[in-house]
Regions:
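Active-site glycine-centered loops adjacent to acidic/histidine catalytic or metal-binding residues
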Residues: 14, 111, 135
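Short, charged, surface-exposed secondary-structure boundary motifs
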Residues: 86-89, 138-143, 163-166
C-alpha cells in the first residue's frame, strides 16, 4: 500500500447505547472478544497492509482506550472534547493534524469488522469519496445506500430501506480532503 500521503483514522468515540446493558464499563470498540478488545482485531487487520501510525478518534470513555494502547507508539489518540459524530470527528482530526487537502485518508468504523483487501480498495477507488458496501437481501436493521452506476445517490434511513439494497460496511476512502474544506459545522455525520 502506498503510504506517502495516506492517514488512517478509526472512529472510536461513540456512546455504544445499544450495548450499554452488556458492556457498560468500556466503550464499544473495547468490547472484549476472546480476551482482546474488538478494536484490536480491526487494527491487526489494518497492520497486514499498513505499518505507519493509526489514529483513533475517541470521545466516550477515551481514557480506557488511551490506557490500553499507551505502549503502542504507532497508535495516536485524538480525543474529541464534545461528541462530534462521524464527520465532525474526522474534521476535528484533520484540523488537529493540520493535514493538507492533498492528503488521502481511510476512515474505518471502530465497531465494524470486515477483512477487505485494502490495497485493492485503495487502488480501485477513483472517486473523491469511496465507500465499501455490500448488497444484502434483508435491510430492515440497516440504513442503506441508493447506488446507480457505482455512484451513491442517497443515504437512506432504515424506514426508507427496502430489500436487496447496499449497506455501508464502515470503510471510507477520501482521495483528498476537499470534501471537508468548506464545512463549518463542528458536528455532522459522514452519512448525511
Amino acid at each position: 500500500m502506498k503510504k506517502s500521503n495516506l492517514k488512517i483514522f478509526i472512529l472510536a468515540g461513540g456512546l455504544g447505547t445499544r450495548l450499554k446493558s452488556i458492556i457498560s464499563d468500556v466503550p464499544k470498540p473495547m468490547a472484549p472478544i476472546l480476551n482482546k478488545p474488538f478494536i484490536s482485531y480491526v487494527i491487526n487487520n489494518i497492520r497486514e497492509y499498513y505499518q505507519d501510525e493509526i489514529y483513533l478518534l475517541t470521545h466516550h470513555k477515551s481514557n480506557i482506550i488511551e490506557e490500553y494502547f499507551k505502549s503502542d507508539s504507532k497508535i495516536i489518540i485524538i480525543k474529541e472534547n464534545n461528541p462530534l459524530d462521524t464527520g465532525g470527528a474526522v474534521r476535528n482530526a484533520i484540523l488537529e493534524l493540520n493535514l493538507s487537502v492533498e492528503t488521502k485518508i481511510l476512515v474505518i468504523n471502530g465497531d465494524t469488522y470486515i477483512k477487505p483487501d485494502l490495497n485493492q480498495f485503495i487502488a480501485s477507488s477513483d472517486g473523491q469519496i469511496n465507500i465499501i458496501t455490500k448488497k444484502i437481501s434483508d435491510c430492515s436493521r440497516y440504513n442503506t445506500l441508493s447506488i446507480r452506476e457505482n455512484r451513491i445517490e442517497k443515504f437512506n434511513d432504515k424506514k426508507e430501506s427496502s430489500r436487496n439494497m447496499h449497506v455501508n460496511l464502515g470503510y471510507y476512502l477520501f482521495n483528498d480532503l476537499y470534501f471537508f474544506k468548506d464545512i463549518i459545522d463542528d458536528k455532522f455525520s459522514l452519512e448525511d
